[in-house]
UniProtKB/Swiss-Prot annotation:
Catalyzed chemical reaction(s): urea + 2 H2O + H(+) = hydrogencarbonate + 2 NH4(+)
Annotated TM spans: none
NCBIfam families named among the record's database cross-references: PRK13192.1, PRK13203.1, PRK13241.1, PRK13986.1, urease_beta, urease_gam
Protein name: Urease subunit alpha
Top-level division of the source organism's lineage: Bacteria
Subcellular location: Cytoplasm
GO CC term (a single one): urease complex
Subunit: Heterohexamer of 3 UreA (alpha) and 3 UreB (beta) subunits.
Keyword set, alphabetical order: Cytoplasm, Hydrolase
EC numbers for this chain: 3.5.1.5
Higher taxonomy: Bacteria, Pseudomonadati, Campylobacterota, Epsilonproteobacteria, Campylobacterales
GO MF, one example: nickel cation binding
Biological or metabolic pathway of the protein: Nitrogen metabolism; urea degradation; CO(2) and NH(3) from urea (urease route): step 1/1
Positions of the UniProt region annotated as Urease gamma: 1-102
Amino acid sequence: MKLTPKELDKLMLHYAGELAKKRKANGVKLNYTEAVALISAHVMEEARAGKKSVADLMQEGRTLLKADDVMPGVAHMIHEVGIEANFPDGTKLVTIHTPVEDGGHKLAPGEVILKNEDITLNAGKQATTLEVHNKGDRPVQVGSHFHFFEVNKLLEFDREKAYGKRLDIASGTAVRFEPGEKKTVELIQIGGNQRIYGFNSLVDRQADTDGKKLALKRAKEHGFGVVNCGCDKK
């Protein structure tokens, strides 16, 4: 018997689904993998029988499991199940949204529990204020943890003050500089051991005083917009 990789995957899914069905019949609460396998295997078999449409199976797939049939939190993890099933007239995608009702678990996976009080961003860190001028004809966006000293060379500002610093904004956010725009930003010291590598390779070493002089010289040589350079200082 010669089987394609896709056919082997379907057989594996069938075995997993049958195992999940037996465990459910024995009163065992299913985990994430078992729940998905049970639903998928059922849909594939019904599609192969050819007596039900895609719409029928999309609806039926939501009735196979209840929150009590799965382990706590599993229902909340399964947002949708998509199965490429073989119908008599060809392969079709059956997508089942929210196949298991979550049952209202108070501590569902991924739930965010917030404090009642406000959280101070970067508390205790001294901020440096800089005016930045975008001299380019395209917008420039800078992420929260980018070494600001090494941002786009068409942004002109006092790069010496930006050495070893990043934007004082929430992690994962960014600041956008439109063409010709002047904008004031606040920077804070980058945390950790102050070894800065990558970006535009202006530092690639410990961010100390000697490193600053060398980085400023490189920035000037490579045409980065620098105000109050100080590159020629001994």
